[in-house]
Amino acid sequence: ATLLREERPELSLVYLPHLDYDPQKFGVSGSDMPRLVRELDAACIPLLDAAKEVGARVWIVSEYGHCDVSRPVYLNRALRLAGLLSARQGPFGEVLDTFGSRAFAVCDHQLAHIYVRDLADIPQVAEVISQVDGVGQVFRGEQKGDIGLDHERSGEIVALSEADSWFAYPYWLDDTLAPDFARTVDIHRKPGYDPCELFIDPTIRFPKSRIVSRLIRKKLGFRTLFDIIPLDAGLVKGSHGLYAADPDDRPILVGDGNAPASHLVMTDVRDILLEALLNQG
């Protein structure tokens, strides 16, 4: 709100996480949604007041709706057991060898991109992936166009989970060999999104004491990891990524001006906002 009043940006993107974190952790059915909506409303008030004060137009965009899940699916472990993924032992645990692997998966909730080094291996990799419990659909080649992902940055194979499942990134077969960053918030070294980062490891008896001790070590100049994240992906009860059959579960776009066509694809939102920005008189 202060930024809107003092800096008057032409375009400001604001993320309000109130309906994101709890549904990921506990699932929709396990979250207090009325309370979360009230908290979101309270957070919106100063933003809307500031926008009205400076004459800014407001658009509300949601990316996805959450669903309850009960099963993590480990594609990288399946690829490793099939001899397609390689990991090397380092001083701080096993590290995924992306260049030495014939295939590996980058996981994001209920969707995963599987990158295959040799195109001749695609049929074998697709067969391995399709046989994993919890995998709903597998796309390769031109099939990826059916879900809008036939582009140069996509994996050679794209997998979607079943409705009650989601894709977890771990590639190690023994938790004692997990890399040290697995128990930390580290979005760059993990091959995929890790919703376990929303939790504090419930097996740690005194988590606050551990956090304080790590802060002290860091202040003293020691190499320090805030290793408080659990490895148990079964803690995660909510996810997203699949096409929602029920319109009430789909993303929303709220704004002013002429209503756009129904059934927009998500990439249309950019042009709608740019048009509103450039034609605001």
Task: Name what the model sees in each region.
Residues L47-L235:
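Secreted, luminal/periplasmic, and some membrane-associated catalytic domains
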Residues V236-L253:
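Short glycine/proline-rich, acidic loop/turn segments that cap or connect secondary-structure elements
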Residues H18-D20, P251, G255-A259:
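Short, histidine-centered active-site or binding-site loop motifs used for metal coordination
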Residues A1-I60, M266-A276:
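A long, amphipathic alpha-helix that forms part
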Residues I114, A159, L253-V254, L273:
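A short aromatic-rich beta-strand->coil structural motif
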Residues R5-E6, D150-R153, D246-P247:
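Extracellular/periplasmic catalytic domains that process cell-envelope and extracellular macromolecules
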Residues P9-L13, L111, D249-I252:
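Short glycine-rich loop/turn motifs
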